[in-house]
Swiss-Prot record:
Topological relation to the membrane, as annotated: Peripheral membrane protein
Record comment regarding domains: The twin Cx9C motifs are involved in the recognition by the mitochondrial MIA40-ERV1 disulfide relay system and the subsequent transfer of disulfide bonds by dithiol/disulfide exchange reactions to the newly imported protein.
Keyword Disulfide bond: yes
Gene: CMC2
Record's subcellular location: Mitochondrion inner membrane; Mitochondrion intermembrane space
Subunit structure: Interacts with CMC1.
Main location: mitochondrion
Stated name of the protein: COX assembly mitochondrial protein 2
Domain CHCH per the UniProt entry, residue ranges: 10-54
Motif (Cx9C motif 2): 36-46
Miscellaneous note of the record: Present with 279 molecules/cell in log phase SD medium.
UniProt keyword terms in alphabetical order: Chaperone, Copper, Disulfide bond, Membrane, Metal-binding, Mitochondrion, Mitochondrion inner membrane, Repeat
The species this protein was found in: Saccharomyces cerevisiae (strain ATCC 204508 / S288c)
Length: 109
């Protein structure tokens, strides 16, 4: 059986878990000859759906967290460089200009 079934994330599959346990505990020959396979397949399907739902929820939560982090970064940059990062644009242009001048000096030598 699945070892992680006690986790809270699989409470939606509790009926399938109980049905499979009952089938396994009732008569041993049913388990041996695969007569509990319907319950097992239903449980596997339920666990897969629960897992997919958990993954979807985790992706949505991570996107929300990422958006929050990006807002914070933007706020920090606006505080540091001004609105629309005008100061940063000016500094980047000056840096590129100095780099181009140093490259031209190196090529002319």
């Amino acid at each position: 059986m699945h070892p992680q079934l006690e986790a809270e994330r699989f409470h939606s599959c509790l009926d399938f878990i109980n049905a499979l346990d009952k089938c396994h505990q009732k008569e041993y020959y049913k388990r041996i000859f695969g007569l509990c396979n319907n319950e097992k397949d239903a449980l596997n399907k339920c666990l897969k759906e629960a897992s997919l739902n958990n993954k979807k929820r985790a992706v949505i939560e991570s996107r929300i967290k990422r958006a929050d982090v990006e807002k914070r970064w933007k706020k920090i940059e606006e505080e540091e460089y001004g609105e629309d990062a005008i100061l940063k644009t000016i500094l980047d242009r000056q840096y590129a200009k100095k780099k181009q001048e140093s490259d031209n000096d190196a090529n002319s030598k």
